[in-house]
């Protein structure tokens, strides 16, 4: 998936700012990984939330099985977790020729960790809000 940052400018200010994945709708702003899908072993007991254009001005909240929304604390932001799909593509069985400039970043600020309160959770919904009034939601089911 190729993504580009899109800026909407009005006068001398940014009116909106988001990522746009090639062949994906503008609303596609995050991907949720289920238990066991993290690249790092220590995070495989929970969910990994990849919020593509996250910035410190965003709010990230989770809702487990339709309970109340909970804002994720700042320590849930992972600084050294790779995106699983990028990792598998670059280092998996069908990996392309080694190109250091094209490999997934191991140091990023848009991956979050959330461990559901209940081991028998059914659905976790993530809501990410940016300062431009955009609210993005995505859900994952426990299968």
Where are these regions (language model features)?
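Short edge beta-strand/loop segments characteristic of extracellular beta-sandwich folds
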Residues: 45-54
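Short, compositionally biased P/S/T/A/G/V-rich stretches that sit at domain boundaries
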Residues: 5, 10-45
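Aromatic sugar-binding surface patches on proteins
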Residues: 79-115
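Beta-strand signatures of extracellular beta-sandwich domains
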Residues: 59-63
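Short, small-residue-biased leader/transition segments that mark boundaries at the very start
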Residues: 1-2
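Surface-exposed, short loops/turns at beta-strand junctions within beta-sandwich domains
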Residues: 115-122
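Edge beta-strands of extracellular beta-sandwich domains
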Residues: 134-143
């Amino acid at each position: 998936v190729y993504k580009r940052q899109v800026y909407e400018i009005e006068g001398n200010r940014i009116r909106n700012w988001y990522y746009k994945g090639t062949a994906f709708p503008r609303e596609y702003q995050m991907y949720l990984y289920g238990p066991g899908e993290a690249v790092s072993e220590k995070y495989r007991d929970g969910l990994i939330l990849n919020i593509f254009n996250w910035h410190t001005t965003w709010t990230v909240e989770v809702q487990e099985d339709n309970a109340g929304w909970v804002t994720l604390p700042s320590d849930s932001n992972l600084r050294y977790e790779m995106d699983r799909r990028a990792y598998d593509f670059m280092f998996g069985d069908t990996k392309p020729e080694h190109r250091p400039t094209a490999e997934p970043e191991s140091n990023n600020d848009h991956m979050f960790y959330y461990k559901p309160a209940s081991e028998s959770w059914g659905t976790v919904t993530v809501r990410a809000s940016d300062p431009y009034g955009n609210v993005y939601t995505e859900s994952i089911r426990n299968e």
